[in-house]
């Protein structure tokens, strides 16, 4: 029998317990031994819930129990998740987590600690909820040089942008609706300002490129400045607006960014709507591949966590997950990153054509969408070149990158 302890009985923790209990025959069969949840750690009481029988309030009860083989961390945040995880690994216990903050900040250290003690630290659910993208990068795509990762990695913001697109609603209205439905937190800052996908693209890039990407180095822009008027232009162009976490590995170096993009129907992420996530990966041999599914939610995320539990159950006394190098990735300076841009501007295309062309080169103009303004799409420019041009165009209303 393999005993599991779950740290935290919130949405994901309770989902892990449910998946293991409901699908126990399948989970245990795939693990090669019976999987049992022996403990759940939480400060709260859960009267009337069967979990009350295995509930403990002191982490030492778990870490000192030699029968506990695997610990599942679902508390979120860095502290005390970091301290509990490190202590568990040092005690020779395997740990898996859905905690992107923990992995983005401390992933290399915790994987190294796991290796030192002959156990594993896994985090499949930290980036794509139920989408098995990390295992694919670690196992299936090991023959490829990964050239690009681009993804819709946050269900909350994808829901908001999808609703703004389909209903023509403004940002604040759709955000409140998302909060009322439980898709967005009361404090939605991590989602709408892009901090959540920033950590996720940092983790995926570290896995794919084999070196540490610091999320603090990633240029990050949220969706709070996207308006219903922006979608009027997108519809005219047959495009949609999505927020991407993206990184590229080219001969010039590695770049990374989180920002809204306007994309056409030919983009494989165009059809990823509502709360779903999609992650595009390009390898130098495989070419393009797509991972699609529920990027959040109780049971989809718990399913990915339990996948790690099963993997660790098969390798209880050996370290199988690869460790990326502690060498920090020095990102291409933001001003040198290349993008194309959609721009909204006051005035008319006829009167502004010469000035716009002088500042940005050849562009495609879009007129007749909103009275008193026009739009245009640039060719590929560096961020620095575009910013210099934008300073000289006070009539500019907004800009959104295109892909």
Protein language model features and the residues they cover:
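Rossmann-fold NAD(P)-binding glycine/threonine-rich loop
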Residues: 81-87, 91, 100-138
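Catalytic, metal-anchored helix/loop core of enzyme active sites in primary metabolism
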Residues: 146-150, 158-161, 165, 177, ...
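A conserved regulatory-domain signal marking ACT and ACT-like small-molecule sensing domains
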Residues: 309-403
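Substrate-binding/catalytic subdomain of NAD(P)-dependent oxidoreductase enzymes
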Residues: 175-271, 276-278
